[in-house]
Structure formats: structure tokens, C-alpha cells
Swiss-Prot record:
Single GO term (MF): hormone activity
UniProt entry tagged with the keyword DNA repair: no
Cellular component terms per the entry's GO annotation: extracellular region; extracellular space
GO BP terms in the entry: negative regulation of female receptivity, post-mating; sexual reproduction
Tissue distribution: Seminal fluid.
Main location per the UniProt record: secreted
UniProt feature, compositional bias: Gly residues: 44-69
Region Disordered, residue ranges: 42-252
Annotated protein name in UniProt: Accessory gland protein Acp32CD
Origin species: Drosophila melanogaster
Amino acid sequence: MWRMRMRLLTGYLVLLALGQLPEHGALGQKYYMNFAFNNNNPDGEGGTGVDGGGGGAGGGAAGPGGGTGDSPHSQEGDGSAATDNPNDDHATSADNSLATDGDAIGKKESGGGSDGKSDSKDSSGGNDATPANGHDDDNDDSDSKDAKDRQDKEEEAGQEGKRTDHSHHSSYEISIDDSFGGRYVRSIYESSESHGHSGSNAGSNQRDNGARESSQENQDAKEVASEAPAQRAGNVPDGPETGAKEDDYEEM
């Protein structure tokens, strides 16, 4: 008999607990929604839960006018607390923890906004400090992407290619894109010479010097030939004894 009574009592307690859980869950949801609305709208009636003075006991909700801080939802909570249920303390502590966490999140968000403003000011100041010609004071290669610098380098490379000192130039254009560091190397010209310039290497211009000397000797020979007396017509000197005459082709 007593077993039947214990079963009935246990079933009654279970049903009572199951009936109280949805009520407290809905009440906690109301507290959270009210707190979220007041936190996102600080200009609303009564201000935030911190300024209202009743944010802790009332689940972070602001009272009408910021007086006692008891909202209609907190009164419902007091009425429901009249029943002897140990879960009420847990619900109140959970509401208080939610309120504290929400306040901390709101302060962090406001602090993040101020940091964003300061960052934007710093970035705008950095842009103002950049000279108009595109050159900055850092040590990276960001200046090489300026149009003026590229034109100057192309003109210098063109002038080097037009030189007539028998030097063979080969230019290589290297483009490097480093997306992590933000540094760009647009053009690097490396010239490799096969013969070298005058005075750069010993014996580098022997061919040029030899060509100049041969041209000078040819000019001197022409001057000597013009100064020599012309021979009479018909008197052709004999060649060497072992060879034929120089005008044998005329006789033949």
C-alpha cells in the first residue's frame, strides 16, 4: 500500500516539476528579451538596467522612470517565487549572469567602435603624410610602381641599348607580387655584357683598337702611293727571275 502511495507522490512531483519548467523558461525568455531591447535602445524609457538601479533583481530590465527598478516582469517573477521551488534561485542567478554578460558585451562593442574611429584617423593621417610625387620614407619597393619611375627606367634601358661599343646587352624583367608583405618589385633590369665597355676589363677592346690601327695604316699607305712618282707608260719593270712579269696577262 505504501508503495502505491510513494508512486503516486513521485508521479505528482514529476508532473509538478514538468509544469513549472515551461513557466520559468518562458519567464526567463521574457527577461532576456526585455534586457536585450533596453541594451540596444539606451534612449528608451528608463534607460539601461545599470542606470535604472533595478537591473540585478529584475533581470536587467529598466523600471518606469528609473525609480525602484521593478518592472512588470520582475513582479511576475516575485509572484511566481511564492511557490517553494529551489529552481527559483537558479533562475535568478542565471538572469543576473545574463545581465552582467550583456553589459560587458555592450561595453566591448562601444570600445570597438572608438578603436575603429581612431584607426580610421590614423590611416587618414598616414595618407596625408605621403608626398604628392609618390615617394615615401619606408624601405620597401612600393615606389617602383610609380608611372614616372617606370618611364625613367625604360628610357635609361633604351639609351643603354643604343650604344655602339660592340657590347651585347640582355635585359631581364622580373615581377614579384608579395600579397602578404604588400611589397611590389615592378621591374629589375640586369644587363650582362659579353665584351664589356672600354676600360672595364683588360683587353676588352682589342678588336676595336685593332680595327682603328688597320684603318690608319691603310690611310698612310694611300698617302705614300700618291706622293710616289708615276712610271712611264710602256716601261714595265721585270719581275723577279724566278717568277713571271707582272703584266703577263696583258700580253696573253
